[in-house]
């Protein structure tokens, strides 16, 4: 399938605007953006996947509740405070949604919150009460709007992460855009990262969720930097349907093409996350061929890229390929090491 890379990030698809502002969540960073807002013109099919950590951030609990009907219209994200292990965390996340709902004149239940930053720190509503109206006023359906939002969600990242591609569905040009953050606490099974996708493809909520959960295991769940899985990992997608393609309501050729496009953009974003790992000087990718099944292939690649011994060899430019065999050897699964 052919894809065309386009500018605009999450604002490249039809029907989306974004903004980033400084509102004071990062008290010691007087100018740094720390609040992002993404808004859709229409109520969108939406889906999300989240951390596997048993300790999860309060925004994730709110997201799960708000996404029970499969629809959303806005996303609000802060950096600098994870809103995790705070006594008032869920109430504060809900209050943020109410502020967004009021500022955008939409149902607060159609707002999805996300947070990233320090775990266990107190959090108050005052910065949000200032920042959300300011972000709503600044919303722009432009490349700059996407860039500002991508910048606002950064923590230890060294650069912003955004991408967009176009492809064809049902004779219509469709676009998928993404922004993300995360360079530390990254391990298999989603790890310290936030990612927000927008698309103008028309996809039913059920098929959008299925597509997302099909893509994540082979992309985000295979990514590793330091083997720490965060409490706040979140990947959310909203689909406006404004491209005008026939709505994808069954697993047909258009569905397969949509999954392929999502996979392509997810692979690009994962490379951005891993390549920007805290202290990283190399980006390692592992391709497994002739495995007996997909489960084994993923397990082998995960063992290799997670091996600290192998990472040390790569860092030291030491061609110690025995460390690869060692990592393969302790992988669960039935395969012949003699064929490696």
Segments from the language model and where they lie:
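A structural signal for small-residue-enriched, beta-sheet-centric alpha/beta enzyme cores
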Residues: 1-91, 95, 101-340
């Amino acid at each position: 399938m052919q894809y065309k890379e386009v500018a605009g990030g999450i604002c490249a698809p039809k029907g989306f605007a974004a903004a980033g502002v400084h509102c004071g969540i990062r008290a010691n960073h007087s100018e740094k953006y720390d609040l992002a807002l993404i808004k859709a013109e229409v109520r969108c099919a939406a889906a999300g996947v989240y951390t596997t950590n048993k300790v999860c951030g309060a925004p994730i609990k709110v997201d799960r509740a708000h996404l029970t009907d499969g629809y959303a219209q806005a996303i609000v994200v802060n950096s600098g405070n994870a809103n995790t292990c705070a006594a008032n965390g869920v109430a504060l996340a809900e209050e943020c949604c109410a502020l967004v709902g009021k500022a955008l004149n939409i149902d607060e239940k159609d707002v999805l919150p996300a947070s990233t930053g320090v775990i266990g720190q107190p959090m108050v509503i005052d910065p949000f009460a200032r920042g959300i109206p300011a972000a709503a006023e600044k919303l722009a359906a432009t490349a700059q709007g996407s860039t500002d939002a991508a910048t606002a969600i950064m923590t230890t990242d060294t650069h912003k992460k955004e991408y967009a591609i176009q492809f064809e569905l049902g004779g219509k040009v469709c676009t998928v855009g993404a922004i993300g953050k995360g360079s530390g606490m990254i391990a298999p099974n989603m790890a310290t990262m936030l990612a927000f996708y927008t698309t103008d493809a028309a996809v039913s909520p059920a098929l959008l969720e299925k597509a997302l959960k099909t893509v994540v295991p082979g992309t985000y769940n295979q990514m590793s930097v330091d083997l720490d899985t965060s409490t706040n990992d979140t990947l959310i997608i909203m689909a406006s349907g404004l491209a005008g393609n026939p709505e994808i309501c069954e697993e047909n050729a258009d569905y397969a093409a949509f999954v392929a496009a999502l996979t392509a953009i997810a692979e690009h974003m994962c490379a951005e996350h891993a390549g920007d790992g805290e202290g990283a000087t190399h980006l390692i990718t592992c391709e497994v061929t002739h495995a007996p099944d997909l489960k084994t292939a993923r397990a082998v690649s995960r063992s290799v890229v997670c091996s600290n011994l192998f990472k040390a060899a790569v860092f030291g430019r030491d061609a110690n390929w025995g460390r690869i065999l060692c990592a393969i050897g302790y992988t669960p699964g039935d395969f012949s090491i003699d064929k490696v």
